[in-house]
Design a protein with these regions (language model features):
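Flexible, low-complexity charged segments
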Residues: 1-135
Length: 135
């Protein structure tokens, strides 16, 4: 009888451990927002007056491996974004719709860079945490 009770107790104590292992195996990959730090700062537009921008950018990736690859290629990503921002005109940044188009174009370019380097885009979305324009 004592043996049966001990066996049942041992089985009961091991169930939470088995449930935890199943949860880890079936868990969805973690979504990570990787902030490009420091913020992107530069000038844009043409004309006699310099116009400046400051953009705090976050990249959404799924999984730690994807984030590690994005971090590895961050200098290339930053360069691509700086070049994109420097090509903008005052008109292309004047409205919220224009800023959304810029965000979408930035996402496309980041995905293209990562596709060229890693064989797949890795970044699912690009977000402007803050976009400041001074003209």
């Amino acid at each position: 009888m004592k043996t049966v009770v001990a066996l049942l107790l041992a089985c009961a104590l091991s169930l939470p451990v088995l449930a935890e292992e199943e949860k880890k195996e079936g868990a969805a990959p973690q979504v990570i927002y990787h902030n490009l730090v420091p913020a992107l700062v530069g000038n844009y537009g043409v004309g006699p007056r310099l116009k400046f921008y400051k953009a705090d950018v976050a990249l959404r990736v799924t999984g730690v491996d994807a984030e590690a690859k994005v971090i590895h290629h961050e200098p290339l990503i930053r360069n691509q974004l700086v070049m994109l921002f420097s090509q903008q005109t005052e008109e292309s940044l004047a409205s919220p719709d224009a800023k959304e188009l810029l965000r979408q174009e930035a996402l496309k370019q980041v995905q293209q860079v990562l596709s060229d380097e890693e064989g797949r885009p890795l970044v699912e979305d690009l977000l402007f945490n803050n976009l400041i324009l001074q003209g």
